[in-house]
Amino acid sequence: MSGSCQFLSRETLSSSLGWIPLINALREIFTENVVCPTRLHYPIDEDNPSSTANNILLIMPCWIPGKFLGVKQVNVFPENTKHGLPSLSSHYLLSDATTGCHLAQLDGNELTSRRTAAASALASSYLSKEDSTSLLIIGSGKVAEKLIHAHCSVRPIRSVRIWNHRFESAKSLASRASKELPSIQIDAVPIQNLENAVKCSDIISSATLSKKPIIVGSWINPGTHIDLVGGFTPHMHEADSKCIQISNVFVDTRKGALHEAGDLLTPIKEGLFSPNEVIADLFDLCNNKHSGRSQLKNPAEAITLFKSVGDSREDLAAASLAYKVHNKSS
């Protein structure tokens, strides 16, 4: 691991990070000895009383002793969408953990969206029914787009519905995804038809920055798997408290989800859910300490819910895989 620092673009990451290899890399890193300090989280407008923005700076370091060292900077500016700009901008720096030499700078947005979707698919491989054929995507951003491909890589999905509070955005994503996955029926859901779409879906995957619940617990049918991706602060909510109450809850990491996920912290504060009710995290699943849906009482009818807030070991797994694949092929 030597030489000049490379730049791995969005296009390079897209070609280097196939879904199954990436999912397997995530599965493996949750079994390894990884140093993963707490993510640093800074509300950058906190000291500006005149600002109504909720802009956030995230710093996420991680390393495997003797192998790779990485750090990601993420800037979250939710109001950017009003100006036609991305709400999330990031970059990743990968280094040699033995020498400290920089190996590669990677497009952080592509890295984040791909590893996030892959983590959801990894969880789904344990938690959704193996014969799941219908997928509902809530949201229409970059992560939502990746979630379609990731979920379809682990389950025999035949139909995908996309819902967004801006219908035209959902239609645009449906059009793009249909061209990329021509064998799958992909449609946009009219804004008023969300409840019916939820009731008709085997897997529901939500990737929004919503501060108000979108998914209502009373809409959920037995056997459904719910994947909550978007909310990564205590003030964000994609599902109501009833949805958490009726579900068998799994998380990416207990430390992260129980500290940052509003979808869990709100029902905990309301006395409707306890941290002890989290059944397992990705460490448990990947190390065979819990088998997921198959270990639940009445697996066919169980409602499963996976809440993720992101973890820096996922970035390191994706970045190191991309670096190795790119250098093997170049």
Curated annotation (Swiss-Prot):
InterPro entries to which the protein is assigned, alphabetical: NAD(P)-bd_dom_sf (IPR036291), ODC_Mu_crystall (IPR003462), ODC_N (IPR023401)
Keywords: Cytoplasm
GO molecular function: catalytic activity
Record flagged with keyword Cytoplasm: yes
Compartment(s) where it occurs, according to its Swiss-Prot or TrEMBL record: Cytoplasm
Homology family: Belongs to the ornithine cyclodeaminase/mu-crystallin family.
Protein name: Uncharacterized protein P11E10.01
Organism, scientific name: Schizosaccharomyces pombe (strain 972 / ATCC 24843)
